[in-house]
């Protein structure tokens, strides 16, 4: 458990991502202040966190070594930003994905923080150079992009501004490890970071295969969930290459020409419109109707699966 000397953490924004971050930091023993401009949103968020933590404790899925009550005691709400950030060592911004809104928040923070606190954004796609340029504390700024839902999916992409101090990256990396996340260092900024670039590449080819009537939407998803996805839940594409031959060099010697031939047949970026949208939507809605009730139930099932998978991954760590 983190000692009081370790300082506190501030979450700016009390939506789903903000609540998830609050729970994660509390699981690591950190005192957390949840800031929002609306007191009712803070009240609702704290109640949501209480229910979620109690449910996790009952199912044996609560993170960390502290009880739910102890973790909950570490989380408080605050409607005054200056008061919230006093004594903080890490501030995690979690407002909606709007560049001007995020820049406004960081400009406010820039005026009131000291030279030690880390200013971190949860942005999934906004480049650090767009978010942080011009700030007096730019060396302390970094993007820490979580994967939804962060409590069950541990990856966090750490993306620096060109002026981010190496110590900021190192401290953020250590902090993410301390609360049980799996941080990766993105060495320089790039559109989409790493996760979304990989995700969009898969979505793009998946869309083309459906659009060209190579495979149905439901069978396409099955290729991932019962094929590639099962493997990738434990090892990545590069280790897959390594294991599917006698190492990476052997794999490239054997399969590079075949890979290049297939890759040369890939088409342009899809438009994601027209008849294919209707076809994919119809197929998905047969499986999960797109009304709020069915979508919420399916998301809960997804989260339950991810929770159990995270337990299995922990149990199956290589020796």
Curated annotation (Swiss-Prot):
EC number: 1.1.1.45
Organism classification: Eukaryota, Metazoa, Chordata, Craniata, Vertebrata
Record comment: activity regulation: Inhibited by malonate.
Stated name of the protein: Lambda-crystallin homolog
Class of this enzyme: oxidoreductase
GO annotation, cellular component aspect: cytosol
GO biological processes: D-glucuronate catabolic process to D-xylulose 5-phosphate; fatty acid metabolic process
InterPro entries: 3-OHacyl-CoA_DH, 3-OHacyl-CoA_DH_CS, 3-OHacyl-CoA_DH_NAD-bd, 3HC_DH_C, 6-PGluconate_DH-like_C_sf, 6PGD_dom2, NAD(P)-bd_dom_sf
Subunit structure: Homodimer.
